[in-house]
């Protein structure tokens, strides 16, 4: 977000992003993470058997992934950057996919609330209202 904001403000013609953009990642807004944790504390009381069998692990997530290309396009749109995106394929993509199985949380009755684009917009608004000179950090 910062990189695209600075490119917009400085009228840069392009933003360079590492990798091919093909890797896929899952993103969860922090408010949803907090809500999911509280939900588990209130609604999940494992039995001794569940504890012994290791059935106490729950993934908090959306269960949906996006490519880094899709993410970058969303950020570009949210920020209002009009330049081009250049992919530096000499840099690594990392793991091809990171996606959680959230079916156990869904069975308990919990689901995330904030869609990725809305979360990015909220994060960008926060950044605009609270930014500091991050170039020197």
Specify the residue positions occupied by each region the protein language model found:
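C-terminal substrate-binding subdomain of Rossmann-fold SDR/epimerase-dehydratase oxidoreductases
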Residues: 6-137
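Conserved AAA+ ATPase "sensor/coupling" helix adjacent to the nucleotide-binding pocket
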Residues: 3
């Amino acid at each position: 977000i910062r990189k695209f904001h600075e490119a917009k403000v400085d009228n840069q013609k392009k933003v360079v992003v590492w990798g091919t953009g093909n890797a896929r990642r899952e993103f969860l807004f922090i408010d949803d993470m907090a809500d999911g944790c509280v939900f588990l504390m209130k609604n999940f009381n494992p039995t001794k058997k569940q504890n012994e069998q290791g059935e106490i692990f729950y993934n908090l997530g959306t269960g949906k992934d996006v490519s880094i290309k899709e993410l970058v396009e969303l950020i570009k749109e949210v920020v209002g950057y009009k330049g081009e995106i250049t992919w530096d394929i000499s840099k690594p993509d990392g793991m091809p996919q990171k996606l959680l199985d959230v079916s156990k949380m869904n069975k308990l009755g919990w689901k995330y609330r904030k869609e990725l684009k809305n979360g990015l917009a909220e994060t960008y608004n926060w950044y605009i209202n609270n930014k500091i000179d991050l170039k020197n950090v």
